[in-house]
Amino acid sequence: MAKKYFGTDGVRGEVGQFPITPDFVLKLGYAAGQVLVQHDTDQKPTVLIGKDTRISGYMLEAALVAGFTAAGVNVVQTGPLPTPGVAYLTRALRLSAGVMISASHNTYSDNGIKFFAEGGVKLSDEVELEIEAKIDEEMKTQPSARLGRARRISGADDRYIEFCKSTFPGHSDLRGLKLVIDTANGAGYGVAPKVFHELGAQVVSIGNEPNGYNINEKCGATHTKTLQAAVLQNEADYGIALDGDGDRLMMVDKNRQVYDGDSLIYVIAKARAREGINIGGVVGTVMTNMAMEIALKEQGVDFCRAKVGDRYVLEQLNQRGWLIGGEASGHILCMDKHNTGDGIISALQVLAALQILNQDLATVCADWQPYPQTMINVRIQKGQKWQEASKDVLAEVEKELEGKGRVVLRASGTEPVVRVMVEARQADWARDGAERIAAAIGGI
């Protein structure tokens, strides 16, 4: 059954436009509260709510609190806290569910609602459908004796900081390192610099002055130029960039070289292999560069691909019992450290890996160079049989690139576009293959 309101990462959109309106979010909180009450019959459920620094967070938090308490659910509020911090505290405090108010790397004019189940894991499709079924029902507030309470929780930041630090090797520290930390004027501004400082690093903080409107604005993991300049200006060893809700990571070295999620995953996996730790393998996505796959296999590390999205990477990790996964966008999962993507913890794992390998980022990542990619968006008509039109040329290109490149065709879920991606050992092979396939699709 198709979902009506939930996307791949909760409910998200432009503030003031459906579904990110106070009245809908009130109903969403009430519907989720009803489902919790039905599932937790022994005692009154308690939900933890965190948020990033968007101005709309105040409005949406109030609406959620009203909905949950009307359904008979207690609420604890953390204030600004990274998404993985909400997941951790939901598990650590043994709460019924967690909710994060954020639109991740989007601009301040967007926002969203993301749910975590008991244990800090993402909601199943079945539970999301249960919630959706109740959203359109009439709200019937619980009798006064059964209404929920709401309160602010103290020490949430400190609990999460200590958890992050606990994932770094206990026999080591970060003394001698100078780091620039860019928190994207987002949810990590109050916690990320403290984590690295308390582990001994000299920390320079940027993107740490949120005003409600500047989240992700020319800063953070989606805009690394600011970090590159700051690393150079401060003569730092590395720069660490998070996104608005703190679950993505990009890094920069002293030469201003940017390292994406693929490169950082490789560093972590290589160090684990060097230590003899059995990680099972690495899960990437259909967009992960083929050169990384080959480099991992040369280290004796298995590799598989999931659909694009950290949700699908997580599914594959759980199914296979593997420990490391992620995507180039900076979502990195280290399942032996946390059960969700965490930018701070991922950065700590990279820094620990560099100590284990006794090399810098540039040296480790010199093991492989990304294959050149050509991407072409082909606009099509509704109902156009593009698969049939392109199958012969697709087969030809795939045969030519066997063992030295690959092809990915993806139909957009939001617009009438087919995305053609070809990567190959040589740039002209990739360009030629992509152009031939795009021409065969036809387009308009």
Swiss-Prot record:
Coiled coil: none annotated. InterPro entries: A-D-PHexomutase_a/b/a-I, A-D-PHexomutase_a/b/a-I/II/III, A-D-PHexomutase_a/b/a-II, A-D-PHexomutase_a/b/a-III, A-D-PHexomutase_C, A-D-PHexomutase_C_sf, Alpha-D-phosphohexomutase_SF, GlmM_bact. GO terms for molecular function: magnesium ion binding; phosphoglucosamine mutase activity; phosphomannomutase activity. Pfam families: PGM_PMM_I, PGM_PMM_II, PGM_PMM_III, PGM_PMM_IV. Catalyzes the conversion of glucosamine-6-phosphate to glucosamine-1-phosphate. One of its GO terms (cellular component) is cytosol. Belongs to the phosphohexose mutase family. This is Phosphoglucosamine mutase. Binds 1 Mg(2+) ion per subunit. The active site is at residue 104. NCBIfam families: glmM, PRK10887.1. The keyword Metal-binding applies. The keyword ATP-binding does not apply. Activated by phosphorylation. It comes from the Bacteria. Mg(2+) binds at residues 104, 243, 245, 247. Its EC number is 5.4.2.10. It catalyses: alpha-D-glucosamine 1-phosphate = D-glucosamine 6-phosphate. Gene3D superfamilies: Alpha-D-Glucose-1,6-Bisphosphate, subunit A, domain 3, Alpha-D-phosphohexomutase, C-terminal domain. Keywords: Isomerase, Magnesium, Metal-binding, Phosphoprotein. The modification Phosphoserine is found at residue 104.
